[in-house]
């Protein structure tokens, strides 16, 4: 799909291009001048227009994390990429490019309007994550298979579709097929769907649609079951007790234990293993239930902390707003009085009073902020102690339970070794009545061989138990450290932001006063 500007030199989406685009589309006049002076942060941009730029590759958009509308039409883009961070995107135009495949849209879960018309796309897929999609423009591509239409049934919000100019749109059954299989569609190829035609299409394809709905219902049920399992697993991971609500840890001990599996053929070992497994799983379940209980306590502690923090911040903000409101009321009266004053000495006196007033406001707001910092610091320190104590208690009790698992393993090891030695003696004396597999009998050549085999099995089991303990302890300690670190960093950022706001407000007040002095009075 060659375009006149394809012969131009391809451009790179670098910072200069993005800054220029943001500047051109930003606020104008006084607001625009202020924005240019202070600089517009990419994360604050909601809409970005980059059409007709001869862009070959999408890049450097990761900072536009709050972008809602992106226009990249009429370029020479060959691949959909570089959009991963734009999770708030609602509207995306990639029409009139050289795109051959739909890809790179998995994180755009809020996208409602997508235009891919006038490209080289031959297959409709890789849109599964776009659950809010309402408008899809795919006109003038290379789509030829009617099955692409059935794929679009997974988008419950889809109301507008454009496929005109594709080979598929030339099929005799094109419209009837779409009317039947996309029953909620309102507009097709820029025309409203004819309701009579829709009903006729439904009747014609009724049997096929019923079969398809049945398959979709079964698939949906499986997906919901898998989703529920995954959600439960995530809950268990948050509690650091995943896969401890059953025989998973015990089974993992034997999954790589070649010698242990051979030894299970010895007389009496099966019964020994069953009893061992039952007791081991009970301890794992105790760890699991205790972990969920402690996770709930940590959640309550964190929720209470966040509520206290927000309450303190809001109360402080209300006090600050009250001080500012009183200041602004008085300041406005003073400004009006200065404008009406004709005596120069009185004007200078009032200007001095206004400047002092601004200074007093600054001091008041900064004192409020310092008080808040101290209050929040105390709250954070209390929370840090509480959450650290909860984590420490959790680790201590879990380690005690895991020690019981080791005791069971040690006891099992002793019993297994006893059975193995007795079996060796029977084999050497020719008193072994039971048949054993050849690879098992090969272990009983001498005492050292069988003792080493039992010991190797025991070492594997202890290693699995130790690794699971390390995983749990490391996991919750890391979580606690990262949480506390983030809380401290967030508070530092909040404080810096607030101090900056106070300084900017005070500077603005002083600038307004200075402009009044230099303008209204001297003139």
Curated annotation (Swiss-Prot):
Identify the stretches annotated as LRR repeats: 44-65, 66-87, 88-109, 110-131, 132-153
A GO CC term assigned to this protein in UniProt: axoneme
Q: What is its main location?
A: cytoplasm
Entry-linked Pfam families: LRR_9 (PF14580)
Q: Which domain of life is it from?
A: Eukaryota
Q: Does the keyword Coiled coil apply?
A: yes
The LRRCT domain covers 166-204
Q: Which segments does the entry list as coiled coil?
A: 204-242, 333-393
Is Cytoplasm found in the keyword set?
Answer: yes
The subcellular localization recorded is: Cytoplasm, Cytoskeleton, Cilium axoneme; Cell projection, Cilium; Cytoplasm, Cytoskeleton, Flagellum axoneme; Cell projection, Cilium, Flagellum
Keywords, ordered alphabetically: Cell projection, Cilium, Coiled coil, Cytoplasm, Cytoskeleton, Flagellum, Leucine-rich repeat, Repeat
Name the InterPro entries for this protein: Cilia_flagella_integrity, Leu-rich_rpt, Leu-rich_rpt_typical-subtyp, LRR_dom_sf
Gene3D superfamilies listed in its UniProt record = Ribonuclease Inhibitor
Q: Which PANTHER family match?
A: DYNEIN REGULATORY COMPLEX SUBUNIT 3, PROTEIN PHOSPHATASE 1 REGULATORY SUBUNIT SDS22-RELATED
How does the annotation summarize its subunit structure?
Component of the nexin-dynein regulatory complex (N-DRC). Interacts with DRC1. Interacts with TCTE1/DRC5. Interacts with DRC7.
Task of the protein: Component of the nexin-dynein regulatory complex (N-DRC) a key regulator of ciliary/flagellar motility which maintains the alignment and integrity of the distal axoneme and regulates microtubule sliding in motile axonemes.
The family note in this entry says:
Belongs to the DRC3 family.
Q: What is this protein called?
A: Dynein regulatory complex subunit 3
State the organism of origin: Mus musculus
């Amino acid at each position: 799909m060659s375009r006149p500007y394809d012969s131009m030199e391809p451009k790179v989406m670098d910072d200069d291009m993005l800054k220029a685009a943001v500047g051109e589309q930003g606020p104008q006049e006084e607001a625009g001048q202020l924005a240019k002076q202070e600089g517009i942060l990419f994360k604050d941009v909601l809409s970005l227009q980059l059409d007709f730029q001869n862009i070959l590759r999408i890049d450097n958009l990761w900072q536009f994390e709050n972008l809602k509308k992106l226009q990249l039409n009429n370029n020479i883009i060959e691949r959909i990429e570089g959009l991963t961070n734009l999770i708030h995107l609602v509207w995306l135009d990639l029409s009139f490019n050289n795109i051959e495949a739909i890809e790179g849209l998995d994180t755009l879960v809020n996208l409602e309007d997508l235009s891919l018309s006038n490209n080289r796309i031959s297959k409709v897929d890789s849109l599964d994550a776009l659950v809010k999609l309402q408008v899809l423009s795919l006109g003038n591509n290379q789509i030829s298979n009617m099955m692409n239409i059935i794929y679009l049934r997974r988008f419950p919000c889809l109301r507008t579709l454009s496929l005109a100019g594709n080979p598929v749109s030339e099929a005799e059954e094109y419209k009837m097929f779409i009317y039947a299989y996309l029953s909620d569609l309102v507009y097709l190829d820029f025309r409203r769907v004819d309701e009579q035609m829709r009903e006729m299409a439904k009747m014609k394809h009724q049997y096929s649609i019923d079969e398809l709905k049945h398959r979709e219902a079964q698939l949906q049920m499986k997906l919901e079951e898998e989703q529920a399992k995954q959600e439960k697993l995530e809950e268990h991971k948050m509690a650091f007790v995943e896969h401890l609500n059953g025989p998973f840890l015990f089974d993992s001990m034997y999954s790589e234990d070649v010698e242990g599996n051979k030894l299970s053929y010895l007389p009496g070992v099966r019964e020994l293993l069953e009893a061992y497994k039952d007791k081991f799983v009970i301890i794992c379940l105790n760890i699991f239930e205790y972990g969920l209980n402690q996770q709930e306590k940590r959640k309550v502690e964190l929720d209470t902390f966040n509520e206290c923090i927000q309450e303190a911040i809001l109360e402080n903000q209300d006090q600050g707003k009250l001080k500012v409101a009183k200041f602004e009321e008085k300041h406005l009266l003073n400004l009006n009085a200065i404008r009406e004053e004709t005596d120069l000495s009185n004007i200078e006196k009032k200007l001095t009073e206004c400047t002092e007033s601004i200074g007093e406001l600054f001091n008041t707001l900064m004192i409020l902020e310092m008080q808040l910092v101290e209050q929040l610091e105390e709250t954070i320190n209390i929370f840090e102690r509480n959450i650290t104590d909860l984590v420490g208690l959790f680790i201590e009790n879990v380690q005690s339970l895991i020690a019981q698992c080791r005791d069971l393993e040690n006891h099992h090891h002793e019993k297994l070794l006893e059975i193995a030695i007795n079996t060796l003696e029977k084999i050497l004396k020719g008193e072994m009545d039971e048949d054993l597999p050849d690879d098992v009998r090969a272990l009983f050549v001498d005492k050292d061989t069988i003792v080493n085999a039992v010991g190797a099995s025991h070492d594997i089991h202890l290693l699995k138990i130790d690794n699971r303990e390390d995983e749990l302890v490391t996991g919750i300690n890391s979580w606690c450290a990262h949480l506390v670190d983030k809380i401290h960093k967030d508070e530092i950022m909040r404080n810096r932001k607030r101090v900056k706001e106070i300084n900017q407000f005070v500077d603005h007040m002083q600038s307004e006063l200075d402009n009044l002095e230099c303008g209204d009075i001297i003139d």
